[in-house]
Amino acid sequence: MPKEIKEIKDFLVKARRKDAKSVKIKKNSNNTKFKVRCASYLYTLVVADKDKAEKLKQSLPPGIQVKELK
């Protein structure tokens, strides 16, 4: 089941959880979507600012698998 997250800090907390398996990054012309797969939910964060999206990408935990989609 998907759930949308509005705050970047909440997304980073979810990404650092033990059951977080992977993060998918999907870039459009208008915004960037970050999707973290946990055990029960797929959490989604939509970021419109490209600079914030780049900073968020760099602040993801190092042990998690990151996959970039088109």
UniProtKB/Swiss-Prot annotation:
Top-rank lineage group of the source organism: Eukaryota
GO cellular component terms given for this protein: cytosolic large ribosomal subunit
Keyword Ribonucleoprotein applies: yes
InterPro entries, alphabetized: Ribosomal_eL38, Ribosomal_eL38_sf
GO molecular function list: structural constituent of ribosome
Pfam families referenced in this protein's UniProt entry, alphabetically: Ribosomal_L38e
Coiled-coil ranges from the UniProt annotation: none
Alphabetical keyword list: Ribonucleoprotein, Ribosomal protein
Single biological process term from Gene Ontology: translation
Keyword Ribonucleoprotein: yes
Gene3D superfamilies, A to Z: 3.30.720.90
Similarity comment: family membership: Belongs to the eukaryotic ribosomal protein eL38 family.
Stated name of the protein: Large ribosomal subunit protein eL38
Native species: Caenorhabditis elegans
Name of the gene this protein is made from: rpl-38
